[in-house]
Amino acid sequence: MLSENEIKILSYLKLKKKANAEEISKELGLPLSSIFSLAKLLEEKGYVKIGERKIIRFELTEEGKKRLKEGFPEEILLKELNGQPSLIEDLKNKMGKDLEIAISWARKKNLVKIDQNRVIPNTSNYTFSTEKEALLKPESADEKVLQELLSRKLITRKEESKLEITLLKEEFEEQNYITQLTSELLRSKDWKKYKIREYNVEALPPYFPLAKKHFFRDFIEKLKDVMKELGFTEVNAGYIEMELYNFDLLFQAQDHPAREIHDSFRVDGLGKIDDERLLKEIKEMHEKGWKYSWDPQIAKRLVLRSQTTAVTARILSSRPSVPFKGFSLGKVFRPDSIDATHLIEFHQLDGVIIQKEFSFTDLLGILREIFYKIGIKEIKFKPGYFPFTEPSVEVYGKIEGLGWVEMSGAGLLRPEILKAMDIDANAGAWGIGIDRLAMLLFGLKDIRLLYANDIDFLRKMKVRL
């Protein structure tokens, strides 16, 4: 059974025998996409054969148009020489930057020779008619001339594929079909002139993809849900932070390499610190622990936070009620070369537990529970070092196909830090690189794909937590 539009296509092909899809679309006034699908249906029914014909087109570039109008550089050079030798310096004053190109091509064509600082013509009657004809009609140009024009970027070559439809059966039933009976058709009895189209009750409806969140944003939201389910309170702070919270309060010395300009983004201006007691305690902590003269002006410098542990530092400085369980998940910034595994802007999750009897064993237990809920069932711990925790631990998770991969750094906060914050309790803290974790869980080879906007790619990505 043929549809009305299928009959239109066959009727047109009956006259032409063969036509491309664009031509049929234009003549029948049907969308090109409809011609493609209808041709496929007709091919399945044996009425037509679909083929592909490659068409090569050449187009003049802006430089090509210029040369057609003004002449080739070597052509202009010959005109300037007018059959007589000339100094390169004199020619350069007249032709400018085109002289180098002109000499290069003129020598290739044996039109000139160079003798010391002079250009000497070998001919004065060379015509450029072949090259100009090739610019006007590249399709019929000599292959050697064509390649020259292409290499000089005077023309571009474009290859197009045309869908060509050939009629196989000239006999077909030119019967009009209707899809529904109307009261007018019944009254006038005109329905007898038509065939009623059959319905395929087994046909599936068209697929309409539903809207959904970007998979990485969804992943971050689900991580937050995991932390909240475990009783943690989300705490946020700004991206611009004083070095006091980003470094000093975390017992990182003021001469530490991480504080250099190449490891953190500096921001103009200075912050303000009103808590004199806090400054005094931090000064004592640094000068006693690191044996140097601590400078409060350095602590006031502003940076784009390089770790969300800066939020943990702010939590501690606010002297929260004990017990306290908090976390922060947000962007951090570090100078780096962007590639498949590095970005200058990425996400971290930091957590802190402040509790009277909180132990190192308790910390390992909560880390194990967090990673289990994320979907990493097997983890192991190795001793580590971080300036603001002691003891410290590195957390490794087992990822299918990759083996053991580092996931997090953690530890109990140093007594000096807790004393400076006037906190009479133990505290455990940890940090997780979220972008790297997402790469591993989603099986991505390129960290930049976490921020992809390719719709087909995004539709395939699913978050399973």
UniProtKB/Swiss-Prot annotation:
Subcellular location as annotated: Cytoplasm
Keyword annotations: Aminoacyl-tRNA synthetase, ATP-binding, Cytoplasm, Ligase, Magnesium, Metal-binding, Nucleotide-binding, Protein biosynthesis
Entry cofactors: Mg(2+)
Enzyme class: ligase
A single Gene Ontology CC term: cytoplasm
Record keyword Transport present: no
Annotated signal sequence range: none
Entry's transmembrane regions: none
Chain residues that bind L-phenylalanine: 309, 348-350, 388
Family: Belongs to the class-II aminoacyl-tRNA synthetase family. Phe-tRNA synthetase alpha subunit type 2 subfamily.
Quaternary structure annotation from Swiss-Prot or TrEMBL: Tetramer of two alpha and two beta subunits.
The protein's name in its UniProt record: Phenylalanine--tRNA ligase alpha subunit
Annotated organism of origin: Sulfolobus acidocaldarius (strain ATCC 33909 / DSM 639 / JCM 8929 / NBRC 15157 / NCIMB 11770)
